[in-house]
Amino acid sequence: MKKVVVGLSGGVDSSTAAAILHNQGYEVIGLTLWLMKGKGQCCSEGMIDAAYICEQLGIPHEVVDMRDVFQTHIVDYLVTGYGAGITPLPCSQCNKTVKFGPMVQYAREQLGCDRIATGHYARISYDEASGRYQLLRAVDRNKDQSYFLYDLSQDLLAASLFPLGEMEKADTRRIATEHGLKTADKPESQDLCLVESNGSMRAFLDKYIAPKKGDIVDTAGKILGQHDGVHHYTIGQRKGLGIAAPEPLYVVELDAVNNKVVVGDRTKATQEECTVSRVNWVSIPEPSTPIRAAVQIRYRSAPEPVTVIPLENSRVRLVFDEPQFSITPGQAAVWYDGDKVLGGGIIEQFSN
């Protein structure tokens, strides 16, 4: 019998993924990662629900303590990034270093199993010609999570199953209901796990970064107001600046070194290109010449036509066909060919 380890968060998606594989004849082992120190939904209610689902399905359930890893790779990563004036994207980092990597390692070393599965909405295929595993968008475009999975290595893709990739979200809930799963009607998470457990990103960051007053200035250096910490702002932000101006102003730069928030009109928050580092080429090998693609510079943004120019040291330059508003350092840029994820990386800081 084929064996698979299913990552269970205690939500409807991962629960349904486990039920589907169980019905397909897999020997399913449920695995929950204990991520956050202290109290929080994903390490209390979620863990309890995951255990209950395993009992319903008649499968074993294991819990792995990943709190120290999560603290180092996600909490510290976020705090350091925001303190340096960037807006980090923790989810792709978490998927690679906290979830998929450790899950595959645990499955192989502790359970003698080469396959894992999760409730992510994405698809994986194997291309015989290139000998590469390809990451594809989910059938349900509204739920597609391929953007957050761009950093998975070929080894991790080869070991992973996404049972929900060919399904609509409504089908997931229907299957969960048909199986009588406790999580069938469980509401979806609406924000980052850290935000949900702390109330807001501001509240989370204020636990780690002390307020530090500084100037809000325009691009010419004129002081327009005061702020209480650059970590409270993000590129493109318009609301909550606390300054009066005859025209709308947006955050165009976060100068953490000089403790300044730089604002300007919309044109100043618009860029024709950006540089991306820590690039992972997914469905194709790294090209030696520029390629055409469609890029997303944030999760819910529409794909935009772009020329991807390879640089040295796992970096690329993205040149957009049309200037883009609010390109945010620390966020992921992920480029596609249709449904296929070609590659992605982290947007670097730039100066206005």
Curated annotation (Swiss-Prot):
Catalyzes the 2-thiolation of uridine at the wobble position (U34) of tRNA, leading to the formation of s(2)U34. GO terms for cellular component: cytoplasm. One of its GO terms (biological process) is tRNA wobble position uridine thiolation. PANTHER family: MITOCHONDRIAL TRNA-SPECIFIC 2-THIOURIDYLASE 1 (PTHR11933:SF5), TRNA 5-METHYLAMINOMETHYL-2-THIOURIDYLATE -METHYLTRANSFERASE (PTHR11933). Gene3D superfamilies: Adenine nucleotide alpha hydrolases-like domains, HUPs, Translation factors. Its EC number is 2.8.1.13. Belongs to the MnmA/TRMU family. It comes from the Bacteria. Residues 143-145, 298-299 are annotated as: Interaction with tRNA. HAMAP family: tRNA_thiouridyl_MnmA. It is found in: Cytoplasm. GO terms for molecular function: ATP binding; tRNA binding; tRNA-uridine 2-sulfurtransferase activity. This is tRNA-specific 2-thiouridylase MnmA. It is an enzyme of class 2 (transferase). Keywords: ATP-binding, Cytoplasm, Disulfide bond, Nucleotide-binding, RNA-binding, Transferase, tRNA processing, tRNA-binding. It comes from Trichormus variabilis (strain ATCC 29413 / PCC 7937).
